[in-house]
Amino acid sequence: MQTSLLAILLASSFLGFAAPQQANGETDEEITNQIMAIEHEKEAALGKGMSAVADWFERHNADDLAWMGEPGLRTKAEVIHDMRSGNQHVKPERTYDYRVRVHGNGTTAVLTYRTNGTFSIGDKTFGHQLYITDVYAKENGQWVRVVHDSSPVPANKQGQ
């Protein structure tokens, strides 16, 4: 009896060390790695030019994406058009402080990070230090970005 009780206690204590698993069978770590792989793919596309970024954008964003940035709320179609026409350019200098939070039993992931660089649309160029929030949803087994929001880093937090 004591041996059985000890075995149960030991087994249950080790369960706390296992990675949390979502209802879809994936761990938070696996989901984080999937989201970061998409982000790394975007970074690689940025190094190849705006046409490559537009291709990435088309693959990884929902058709009804809500994209909020310097020029305001824009659609996926508007952003892709501006990228392909040469009207929009993004040049990150430093991107860091990545964090992924998993929600909805593994069906939603929120990616936050900071970025410094320049963004231009039309004849307007913005130097920026931004907080970025991207919300991804798992649709038909694939992660798609459904919300992108960029907010300026307050002056007293810049350079940190």
Task: Briefly describe each language-model feature range.
Residues 61, 115-117, 149-152:
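Short beta-strand segments enriched in hydrophobic/aromatic residues
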Residues 117-121, 136:
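Beta-strand elements of well-folded, non-transmembrane domains
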Residues 7-16:
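Bacterial N-terminal signal peptides
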Residues 29-36, 51-107, 124-128:
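A solvent-exposed, acidic/Ser-Thr-rich amphipathic alpha-helical stretch
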Residues 107-117:
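A short hydrophobic beta-strand element
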Residues 129-156:
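Short beta-strand edge/turn micro-motifs at domain boundaries
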Residues 17-60, 156-160:
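Short, low-complexity N-terminal intrinsically disordered segments enriched in polar/charged residues
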Residues 1-7:
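Bacterial N-terminal signal peptides that target proteins for export
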